[in-house]
């Protein structure tokens, strides 16, 4: 054990699973906010790898201010068209000029790298989007603030662990409640295995879960793709198929009563339905920004403590807004996996600018235990796990750079 400031205490509330009302949301991959998150993070990973390959380590950068301005479209059964393209602006800071100690200079085309990474992400994630006509991607990356670059830069030999770039915090929790798990898995299924054999379902899928006592109510907003929907009957059939699929998935995770609603704003008589040309509402009136959607664990959970930091696009080496949100979630999951008798657990990590990121100002763990288990029975084991996770924080950075960790 080290002398890290790790606190373990009882959480002064019941487990979220016992709340009378629980609300959980997930914005799917094609939601405008998630598009921005995904582009920002893919650009982040690409820049980090490029720096590592060119100069041997990651330089100062952030791409967490990416914005999306919605376009205009005219969807129609059998196939419509985009009238005005979506506009995406990748915004941030990135080191484009680096001089090594021996005087070797590196000029890094950061905007070109970012542009190609953004287009690559769109190509892989939104297959119904024509990159030549349906979207404009722009990049504006300035140089970083000098004082933050100094915090980022290693000393002569380089510290074993980077210094925190900010005084900030991250929050994580575990285990997921039944409602949280269902909401997460429903979107992932609709944008994964289900979409593979049902091209009519677009990537813009939002899932809102509400649990009142033992009744889980799910509302799905699913953009359907007009080229694969020939008429209203086909549209209605697709909506019903989605409802049945999500219902079956939900009942695999719970014995509670489940109700599923899909595209509740539809008016079949007037023809007002959720039909798109590209599979995303970004084609028509729905703007997006990094950090307005899912938190680091992929969910929006108002029953839980949450950080308002945008995790996607932040530098994975020393940006606390990214590292501590991912690490606190990882710590919570590790504790629940290894320690018996825990019903609910919350982790809060607070940094102090200039201090090593493996030495938080405080690592606070709050626990709800099962009947028959006291916090005193498990606090030493929890502290050991937290200490080990903090000690290996640089491995988390590597996993993020290599695309092994999701941020939204």
UniProtKB/Swiss-Prot annotation:
One GO MF term attached to the UniProt entry: magnesium ion binding
Catalytic activity line of the entry: L-methionine + ATP + H2O = S-adenosyl-L-methionine + phosphate + diphosphate
Keyword Magnesium: yes
Amino-acid positions noted as binding ATP in the UniProt annotation, renumbered to this chain: 142-147
Cited NCBIfam families: PRK04439.1-3, PRK04439.1-5
HAMAP family attached to this UniProt entry: S_AdoMet_synth2
Protein name, as recorded: S-adenosylmethionine synthase
Organism: Halobacterium salinarum (strain ATCC 700922 / JCM 11081 / NRC-1)
